[in-house]
Amino acid sequence: HFKESDNSLLLFLEEEFNSSNKLIIVTTKHNFSTIGKMISTVTSDNQVLKDQMLIPSKADKYVKDSYLLEYKKSLTNVISMDEMKKMPKILLTSEKNHATINIFEEDRESANALLNSLAQMHEVSFEVITIIEGWLRVEIASKRYGNISNFIDSAKQLLPRKLISTANIIEYIIKVLDANNKKISFAESCTGGLLSYYFTSHNGASKILDGSLITYSNDLKDNWLAVEHDVLEEYGAVSSQVVEQMSEGVINVSHADYGLSISGIAGDTGGTELKPVGTVYIGVRTKTTHQEVHLHLHGDRNYVQQQSALYAIKMLVTIDKEIFF
């Protein structure tokens, strides 16, 4: 906080321009042009009239009572704000300097190799994080003159139907399903409703999810999902045959467009020599196709449950590339 007559303000501005990547300066309407004059002094600039505001000529982005200026290492947003009045738009946002993308069905080494040359071309840096096998999260940061948007567009061309630009994959799935008038439902055993929770913790879930079923016991798999008793007896609840019928059953019950089923042994007990703890089967079904995966996960109960839910999400996205990519 500075007063208008504070002589240290010029020194403060110069220090901040040299050390800060991002800076927001809030001033009263009375001092708005004074601050602009000080900034112009520090940056060897002059003030000009833009949109009925006297602001530094180097401010290339501006709206009423707010402007953005880039100088040295710093992006500075100056805002004129008075009590009892609506706050002006903040122009300094993270979207310009940071973004997240998700890449599917690609290993980390290959993704790094593909993205490295693009990163140099578009002046961005990135970090690849493995969520699960076949699902990578890429955190992108812009350098001073970088262009994240062009980087992502170029990456999409190299990775057709493999890249989704979003920081929150569940929110993205909900929006896509809603836009396409599609519904989803889950039949969960070892995850105990975790997959449902991942979706219902986001706004808009009720538009695409009418309900789901948690069926721990064989009786409920039989009675609620119409899993055949003979199949349960012959193959056991943790089997590809059972998750196939579970996904079919939950679609029949809910009339959803996508049915996801999970059955496994999360631990810490319950495993056998043939089916040790961490054995999980996941099924994903649409009205026209069905996919399954058999996992051998290593970790505690929570880890097995979380990994199982993440694999189901990945399978949902990749089973219908027509709408998700």
Spans of model-derived segments:
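An accessory alpha-helical subdomain
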Residues: 91-151
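Short alpha-helical segments enriched in small residues
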Residues: 1-93, 110-119, 147-325
